[in-house]
């Protein structure tokens, strides 16, 4: 495992390791479908193994950065298991549920993985939003309880002594609450990205995250900002924005 190779990594001059998701997951999307944020995927070991790796890495001057996936969870996460049971349970609004429209999906949004971004659920005769796999329901960041759950989980990891977070598609956590149809560029489905990327409250949420968690620890943060232009990227990581330290985005791949 990683721990046994730390000396080799140090000899190479590596001083930071970024771990892709190692949390408990059904592994529908390479671990980006998390079913328990406070457990390690069995294929990788145990939490005791993680703690030992972190300790040994720090002994060698190597920092550990965790992947943070909080736009969505696995459909096997305890929150979603409860959320889908009824329309009035305490976890219902942890996710984005909508009534169908004329016997079809709530709008024409397509998933990043193909097909509709809405999955019908027979238990309550409603649809839930998943911008990625149908096994990755999007969290409802409009719900303050969801945000507090996320901040509590982040604090838990910071207290362990990790050195940073790489935040997966973090600019997608705020959705346009009118959920309008998207432009149909090709195919059958509309593009959801104009209504979920750089949404109306995303900077509010990140400032709140910074105030409640990040500023309390000596950690590095880098956010993945899907479909963000360079001028907007600077709003996430400006010197005085109190949000993230860095972002990476993909505008450059379309140059030339």
Residue ranges and their predicted role:
Residues 1-155, 159, 172-229:
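Acidic/aromatic-lined carbohydrate-recognition and catalytic surfaces
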Residues 162:
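Conserved protein kinase catalytic-loop anchor
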Residues 225-256:
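Noncatalytic carbohydrate-binding groove/subsite architecture in carbohydrate-active enzymes
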Residues 17, 165-167:
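Hydrophobic residues within beta-strands of alpha/beta enzymes
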């Amino acid at each position: 495992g990683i721990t046994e190779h730390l000396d080799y990594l140090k000899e190479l001059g590596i001083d930071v390791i970024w771990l892709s998701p190692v949390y408990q997951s059904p592994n529908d999307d390479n671990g980006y479908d998390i079913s328990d944020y406070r457990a390690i995927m069995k294929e990788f070991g145990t939490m005791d193994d993680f703690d030992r790796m972190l300790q040994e890495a720090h002994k060698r001057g190597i920092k550990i950065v965790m992947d943070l996936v909080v736009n969505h969870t696995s459909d096997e996460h305890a929150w979603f298991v409860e959320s889908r049971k009824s329309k009035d349970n305490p976890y219902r609004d942890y996710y984005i549920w909508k009534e169908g429209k004329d016997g079809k999906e709530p709008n024409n949004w397509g998933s990043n993985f193909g097909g509709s971004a809405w999955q019908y659920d027979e238990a309550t005769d409603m649809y839930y939003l998943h911008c990625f796999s149908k096994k990755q329901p999007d969290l409802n960041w409009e719900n303050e309880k969801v945000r507090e759950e996320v901040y509590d989980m982040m604090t838990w990891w910071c207290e362990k002594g990790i050195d940073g977070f790489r935040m997966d598609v973090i600019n997608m956590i705020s959705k346009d609450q009118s959920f309008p149809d998207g432009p149909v560029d090709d195919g059958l489905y509309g593009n959801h990205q104009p209504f979920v990327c750089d949404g109306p409250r995303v900077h509010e949420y990140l400032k709140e995250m910074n105030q409640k968690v990040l500023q309390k620890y000596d950690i590095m943060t880098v956010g993945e900002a899907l479909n963000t232009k360079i001028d907007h990227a600077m709003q996430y990581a400006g010197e005085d924005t109190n949000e993230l330290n860095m972002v990476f985005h993909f505008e450059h791949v379309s140059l030339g």
